[in-house]
Regions:
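N-terminal donor/sugar-recognition subdomains of glycan-related enzymes
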Residues: 10-11, 18
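Short amphipathic alpha-helical interaction elements and helix-loop-helix interfaces
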Residues: 67, 195, 199, 217-220, ...
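Beta-strand elements of modular eukaryotic interaction domains
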Residues: 21, 61-62, 229, 284
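Intrinsically disordered, low-complexity regions enriched in proline, serine, glycine
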Residues: 42, 83-84, 233-234, 285, ...
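Long, highly charged, low-complexity intrinsically disordered interaction regions
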Residues: 215-284
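Non-catalytic nucleic-acid-binding/docking modules located in mid-to-C-terminal regions
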Residues: 16-27, 134, 149, 255-390
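Noncatalytic, basic helical substrate-engagement surface that gates or grips nucleic-acid strands
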Residues: 2-5, 12-13, 26-204, 210-214, ...
Length: 390
């Protein structure tokens, strides 16, 4: 999701531009949250058979509200036609993931019945190998010798209880990745936000594009999203990581990126996104241009139009995609909501495992911090109408 290889590029080459601060940095200002990326994260973690994903989202909102941040949640509208290929790839990936989970589940059931085949056993062992190699790479530490997968296919006649549990966990994780929220789930989320007094908006098109446009127009100070397309959408500040436990965030300032890359204007960030590959043109990777090369080319040639010897300019679709990164919307109506306990109780009746205590904290802090903000603004305000957008 987003610009290919860019997060790693920034962290490795320009790590000093990944700022780590407390979320209270944005106290008394408005931030827009691209909900889609967080929904995907929570559903993959918890699935959607319970309300744990919903409780996690309420906890995320609480992190902002209790620190005095005015949060507005943005829901996706209609995706542009240019994103059809990317959406198809996601559907295909979910289908392959489901097939993989089903095959593993069948092999585990065969093991428990004593009918497992050699092929099924090898498949399970390989899954263990791959998962351990992945964990080792993430943790940067050596595996315990007993976990070594070298020669496992021939030397492991059976699977230990611990390995079986590990495999079951892998299957559950894969199954969660295949799940998707229903229309009722989305309605329940909107009802929770409304009940707790958290403002939400339906984007005309994509949430991240609309959120970035709102920030560029001065309606807020930052976009909160996991989608690196926000860099090409040129929001002033993009918060990519939020730790709900500590309130710590990691963000980038797009002007600082421009300065570090020695680019002349923010429009070059659009061409940067097109060159490395974004959600609108996944086929652009045929040119095999990574972030390092993209920065060098734009620094030298200023624009895609001036770059010589590109392997296949047609796959870039740069003229069309530039327009998608420069959307125009009508002036928004951002409505401040008042908490509604009746709506919360109605939702609780449908979802018995909804964390009512967490929702209550969200309402309490929303009311308290909003009152403090209003009093503070009334006492010190000398700003004009444009500044009141915040």
């Amino acid at each position: 999701m987003g610009l290919l290889a860019v997060p790693k590029f920034i962290k490795e080459k320009y790590g000093h531009l990944y700022h780590t601060e407390h979320i209270s940095l944005f106290a008394h200002t408005r931030v827009f949250v691209d909900i889609a990326s967080y929904l995907y994260k929570y559903v993959c973690t918890f699935g959607c058979t319970s309300s744990r994903w919903l409780n996690s989202f309420a906890n995320l909102m609480l992190t902002f509200v209790k620190n005095g941040v005015i949060v507005v949640v943005i829901f996706d509208g209609q995706a542009p036609d240019a994103k059809a290929d990317e959406q198809r790839e996601r559907r295909e990936l979910r289908s392959k993931t489901k097939e993989r989970a089903d095959v593993m589940q069948e092999a585990l059931e065969a093991f428990e019945l004593g009918t497992i085949t050699t092929e099924q056993r090898q498949l399970l062992v390989k899954e263990l190998q791959d998962r351990r190699a992945y964990n080792q790479q993430r943790q940067g530490s050596l595996l315990h010798p007993s976990s070594s997968s070298e020669g496992s296919e021939t030397t492991t006649p059976t699977l230990t209880p611990g390995e079986l549990q590990e495999l079951r966990d892998i299957v559950r994780s894969l199954q969660k990745q295949c799940t998707s929220l229903s229309k009722q789930d989305m309605l329940d989320l909107k009802q929770l936000l409304t009940a707790c007094g958290v403002t939400w908006m339906q984007a005309p098109e994509e949430a991240e594009a609309y959120a970035c446009w709102l920030v560029r127009q001065g309606y807020g100070s930052a976009v909160v999203s996991c989608d690196t397309d926000c860099i090409a959408h040129r929001a002033d500040i993009v918060v990519f990581e939020v730790d709900s436990r500590t309130g710590m965030i990691r963000y980038v300032n797009t002007q600082e990126l421009l300065d570090a890359w020695e680019l002349d204007d923010e429009e070059q960030l659009i061409d940067f996104g097109i060159l490395v590959g974004c959600d609108y043109n996944p086929g652009s990777r045929v040119n095999k241009i990574g972030p390092v090369s993209a920065v060098k080319l734009l620094k030298q040639y200023k624009s895609i139009d001036n770059i010589p010897n590109l392997k296949d300019v047609s796959v870039l679709q740069h003229e069309k995609i530039r327009l998608l990164f420069n959307p125009q919307y009508e002036e928004p109506h951002i409505e401040a909501l008042v908490p509604n306990l009746e709506l919360l109780q109605e939702l609780k009746q449908r979802r018995e495992d909804l964390d009512e205590r967490l929702a209550g904290q969200l309402i309490y802090h929303r009311n308290t911090k909003r009152l403090i903000s209003v009093v503070s603004t009334a006492a010190t305000s000398t700003s004009d109408d444009d500044e009141q957008k915040f």
